[in-house]
């Protein structure tokens, strides 16, 4: 038979989803699995969004405009003003999730062989989107001991060469929960200006900042307006992962023109998803407050529990709803598989994402996992008990000297 493409062979497996068949099999055996592996919010979608879905009364489900409905884009402009992000409807392109926004940013701005600098650990799908676009990810290391803070400028400049085309950040960060400071954002701005790079900024977790520190959007950085592409999504903000609605936002008209060609090729973003997303913008302030308060409590529950567990260390995440934790294990991939295939405590086990899948540096993250705190607190507490029992029983446990 014909061979599979090099692109297909190079495409990485998702560290978040690759163990899913093992979880299905564990459940088939009657094991309860606590899903800490995926950022699927469990909190309710805004009632106004659900009501809009129920009230759809159409005789035809047509293509929507390739750029997305104007009424939705106009309403988004008002939403972003709350964060001091001033854009016009024409600056916004509605996409099939934030993922499509990232992919089209890469496709529109990068040539095959171009390089993107990304702090690691990084959201694993960035690597997949870069491969799809023929580009290459060049990672700059951050460390768990320093809370995954951004390295100094010199470390970036060591990676910059004639092929470097862009810097990609996620702020607040997935998978680490790190929040970039004003100094770090200014550092990135200066690099973008000095080397005339693109800045792709994934800001889908902006609503979840827990430290009292200010939210610094890439759109706030002066002097690089035409270099900046903002990625957004309703998935995490409204617990609407399934409607697949995101946005690509840029003041650069040439980028928008290029992106629109890809949008026209895929015809239209989801019609029904846009109806729900537009209605969800009417969610009351109490909705955002209640969701935020719940994640604050979950973060405390998880991080306190992890750091009380012998041999485990987690920095305190400043945003999003993830943390990367270091475990006393020889290999977190093996450990996560073992938890699903061979272990249970009183008929229960845990599912986590091996952090090595969020790194491109060989061997990095080998003893780390990403944990999403998207379970109710009593389930998080129970999952921590099960995790501790798993670590006690794991044959590959490694004790620090």
List each language-model region with its residue ranges.
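PLP-dependent class I/II
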Residues: 2-4, 8-14, 19-32, 38-56, ...
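Basic nucleic-acid-binding alpha-helical/helix-turn surface characteristic of O6-alkylguanine DNA
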Residues: 59
